[in-house]
């Protein structure tokens, strides 16, 4: 199937997998996968692909309202907002969404409001601590999927260890956006994964060594892996015999120590 494991977080250690790596229970796995095979990949990990019908959002600001507006036609949504005036304002803007005025870190309140019956919980208040604590409350109440907005970069490494399924960071997105403009000419995009010693770099192939041989023969460093190749608007998960063409966009997952070796292949 068109899928590839590109990074593993094992006991706070980052691994770039090779063909002989084995996954063990508790690994946090990052993979590139064709959208049509996501369910199959999830099944391989031993997880269930949960259908989300009921979601609770903590925080009625712009982000919370945006999420609710975009998903209200697909699922039942509740918004929890601590500010009384804000709650009334949201109720007028989103008449078909149930608005609850209260403290999202109050376990008793959240249980009364049915958090334990939700398929997903999204915490997007303006306070990182509130988002983290409320997510822990959701995990305590056995909510299957949790997402938190966390802007303090120092908090990001601990988020996988406390059970968060996903973290969104506006500050990290801004840092990554800035990095795109200070990289070399052959780099189209740059990003990092919170809590992991790995960088994601999208290269534009020129006439370097990367284009002269199948990728299995170009001498790619052990701590780096090609996750995807975009050729003429067609995205593929490459194999060992894939031949990269000039102009292709190549997404590489690499440990920082291997970046220079990777860049030499594209020059």
Positions of PLM-derived features:
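Cytosolic regulatory regions of ion transport systems
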Residues: 1-267
């Amino acid at each position: 199937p068109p899928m590839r494991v590109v990074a593993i977080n094992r006991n706070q250690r980052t691994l770039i997998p090779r063909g002989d790596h084995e996954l063990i229970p508790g690994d946090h796995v990052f993979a590139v996968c064709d959208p049509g095979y996501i369910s199959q990949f999830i099944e391989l990990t031993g997880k269930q692909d949960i259908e989300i019908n009921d979601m609770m959002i903590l925080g009625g600001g712009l982000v919370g309202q945006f999420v609710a507006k975009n998903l209200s036609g697909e699922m039942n949504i509740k918004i929890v907002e601590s500010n009384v005036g804000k709650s009334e304002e949201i109720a007028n803007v989103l008449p078909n969404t149930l608005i609850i005025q209260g403290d999202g870190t109050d376990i008793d309140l959240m249980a009364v409001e049915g958090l334990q019956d939700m398929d997903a919980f999204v915490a997007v208040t303006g306070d990182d601590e509130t988002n983290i604590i409320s997510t822990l409350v959701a995990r305590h109440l056995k909510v299957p999927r949790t997402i938190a907005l966390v802007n303090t970069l120092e908090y990001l490494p601990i988020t996988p260890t406390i059970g968060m399924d996903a973290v969104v960071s506006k500050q990290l997105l801004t840092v990554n956006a800035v990095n795109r403009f200070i990289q070399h000419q052959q780099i189209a995009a740059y990003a990092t994964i919170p809590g992991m010693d790995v960088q994601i770099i999208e290269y534009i192939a020129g006439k370097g060594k990367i284009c002269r041989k199948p990728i299995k023969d170009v001498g790619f460093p052990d701590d780096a892996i090609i996750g995807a190749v975009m050729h003429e608007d067609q995205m593929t998960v490459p194999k060992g015999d894939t031949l990269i063409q000039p102009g292709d966009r190549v997404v590489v997952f690499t440990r920082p120590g291997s970046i220079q070796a990777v860049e030499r292949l594209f020059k």
